[in-house]
């Protein structure tokens, strides 16, 4: 088992991952992406890579999975499965083809609640962490964390901190995003598992287990989360750890948000 797949299995303490054979990832991706390009042609969707934008984010709302595709150097098209991350969307999550316009280290959400490493997709819909009761990293809504992988949000796309921070750090504003629904097929790499946080564990329950903050009481092994990574993604994870730690939001307070009003933001 390659390291990425081993991590996906070992960290999945709530639901087990369903991982497709890496030998068929590319063929699976061709089928999925071809269908999406046709389905969302009226939105202007194209698989031709945008210069300066190495990734396409494909959100399968019904399947609870975000699959990241990178560029096939031979064709210049988004085609290569890079990583799959478990997510929670909502009944009101829109489908379509979009590009990201703005991001926030912390973002005030409906409730009110707060999300880390938020990136706007379209209108009031964002990628963000599982919501927090307050703008403190030890105050996550732990019951909501245990819903990852299911329909649970008010329309935004929730992810574990490790995954949403990857988007925040690696996907420049303007990154293409397609949102669709396919309950039967989560994506070409499969569907990642999920981590269980015990509501009775008062020491750990307030933390997202994957938050790389040194104050996190969870074991460091959970930092890689449950994402299904290609070897290229796993190599990136190892190579970029130093920079990854440098971009942490403050443990206890206020990250910067340039647009922090509740109106127009889901959860």
Predicted features by range, described:
Residues 4, 8, 39, 248-251, ...:
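Low-complexity, intrinsically disordered/propeptide-like segments
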Residues 9-10, 20, 59:
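Intrinsic-disorder/low-complexity regions
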Residues 35-140, 238-239:
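Gly/Pro-biased beta-strand-loop elements
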Residues 30, 75-76, 190:
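Intrinsic-disorder/low-complexity loop/linker signature
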Residues 107-267:
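Exported/periplasmic cell-wall-interacting domains
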Residues 18-44:
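A general sequence property marking short-to-moderate contiguous segments
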Residues 1-15:
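Sec-dependent signal peptide cleavage junction
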